[in-house]
């Protein structure tokens, strides 16, 4: 069994493998343009590692580089092996991927806890669950969420002086971000990555807001989704200082009112719960409230997102990292 870094000429074979062994309708099995958007990096390299023998692929794992360093920070993406005589092939692919990319840090949101999560946890990787926070709008009827407990932190119960200012272009965002500052974050997402990921996406449209309190140094990245003739706002990434999120409850309420959202939610790891509470959010626990995550197709259920990583210190992960926030079909 040979485990190697894929080449661009392998794209059709990897797409066919995904179609046959993951899902016939998966976007990465059917849309080459999107496959190349997500998995051909700035050096024109196809970001997959494959395991093959006698011309047949037995396993693949994709990844996304978040900066252009020699030892980059990366996020794992689709990871799949099929039955064969090679013991622990999935683990071997992961080890080869980390070696071949020379990555500093690697995190993989969206792992299956019954398969890869359990295996990697046994071999020294950190396996954790992302926190799921939400703030609901006070409505008589909810068409997306199922709300049994409408308790929310009242706007103004903490200092609510923070404001959100819409950012219309990456050039505007870039004025407030230095590469040196971005390098202090784990993972390090450089300017090239941020522009490409959120301002040049071929299918999704993202809304970027600067937090103004008292100056602009932190940014919230959101995506609007709809179902059942209703809309919500997903926070998919956050760039900045955790404490800047405090005191935004009034700003969130104003945004929900302007946009007509039922709620705003956020999956994250690394932001202290006390800060999210002071921002007006509530941590989702139990099943009394249902804050759906799946919209393609829509599923009215709560979803836990687990991740595996080789680092936890300083780590901040969000739904937009890896391929958790991408079209499904």
Q: Where do the model's predicted regions map?
A:
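Amide-forming acyltransferase catalytic core, primarily the GNAT-like/NAT-type
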Residues: 11-71, 121-236
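Conserved acetyl-CoA binding element of GNAT-fold acetyltransferases
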Residues: 71-83, 230-241
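Secondary-structure boundary elements
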Residues: 54-55, 99-103
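Extreme N-terminal starter segment of soluble prokaryotic enzymes
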Residues: 1-3
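Long, compositionally biased, intrinsically disordered segments
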Residues: 5, 22-27, 80, 248
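Active-site/acyl-donor-binding loops of N-acyltransferases
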Residues: 34, 65, 104-157, 221-329
């Amino acid at each position: 069994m040979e485990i190697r870094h894929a080449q661009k000429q392998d794209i059709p074979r990897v797409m066919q493998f995904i179609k046959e062994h993951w899902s016939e309708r998966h976007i990465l099995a059917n849309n080459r343009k999107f496959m190349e958007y997500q998995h051909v990096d700035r050096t024109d390299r196809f970001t997959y590692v494959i395991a093959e023998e006698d011309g047949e692929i037995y396993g693949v794992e994709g990844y996304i580089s978040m900066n252009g360093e020699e030892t980059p920070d990366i996020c794992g993406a689709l990871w799949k092996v099929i039955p064969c005589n090679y013991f622990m092939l999935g683990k071997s692919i992961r080890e080869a991927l980390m070696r071949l990319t020379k990555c500093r840090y690697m995190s993989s949101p969206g792992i299956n806890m019954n398969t890869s999560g359990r295996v990697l946890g046994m071999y020294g990787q950190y396996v954790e669950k992302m926190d799921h926070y939400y703030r609901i709008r006070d409505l008589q009827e909810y068409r997306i969420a199922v709300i049994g407990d409408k308790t929310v932190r009242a706007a103004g119960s903490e200092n609510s002086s923070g404001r959100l200012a819409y950012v219309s272009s990456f050039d505007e965002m870039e004025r407030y971000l230095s590469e040196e500052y971005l390098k202090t974050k784990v993972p390090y997402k450089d300017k090239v990555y941020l522009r490409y990921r959120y301002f040049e996406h071929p299918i999704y449209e993202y809304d970027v807001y600067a937090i103004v309190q008292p100056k602009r140094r932190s940014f919230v990245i959101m995506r609007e989704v709809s179902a059942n003739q209703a809309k919500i706002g997903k926070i998919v990434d956050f760039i900045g200082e955790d404490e800047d999120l405090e005191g935004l409850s009034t700003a969130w309420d104003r945004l929900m009112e302007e946009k007509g959202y039922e709620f705003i939610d956020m999956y994250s790891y690394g932001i202290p719960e006390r800060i999210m509470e002071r921002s007006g959010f509530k941590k989702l626990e139990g099943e009394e409230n249902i804050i759906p995550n799946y919209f393609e197709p829509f599923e009215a259920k709560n979803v836990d997102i687990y991740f595996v990583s080789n680092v936890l210190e300083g780590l901040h992960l969000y739904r937009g990292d890896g391929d958790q926030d991408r079209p499904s079909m």
